Structure formats: C-alpha cells, structure tokens
Amino acid sequence: MSFHLWMANLDAYMQETFGVGRRDIADWTYHDAYDDGLTFREAAHQAIANELGS
C-alpha cells in the first residue's frame, strides 16, 4: 500500500473511531510509522495516545 493510500485510510479510520482527523491533532511522525511497518490503525491509536499524553 502506498503512503498516500495508507494516510487516507488512517484519516478515515481516525474520523470513524475517534471523531477527529489527523489534521485536528498535533503533528506526529506518520511517515516513520509507515516506514516501520505499522498498520494505519496502529498508527492512528499511537497518534491519539501521543495527543492525549498517554
């Protein structure tokens, strides 16, 4: 899956699951997560946890 498609899936998943998109929270290292092989779901949960300080 391309990074562009991965990000689109991540953003849709965040909207459906958390009610916010990636542009609604602080910047996070999405490309590093993609390069490390995380799924877009795993990355979304980590980005939200980072936003909440967890």
Swiss-Prot record:
This is Gene 87 protein. It comes from the Viruses. Pfam families: DUF5419. It comes from Mycobacterium phage D29 (Mycobacteriophage D29).
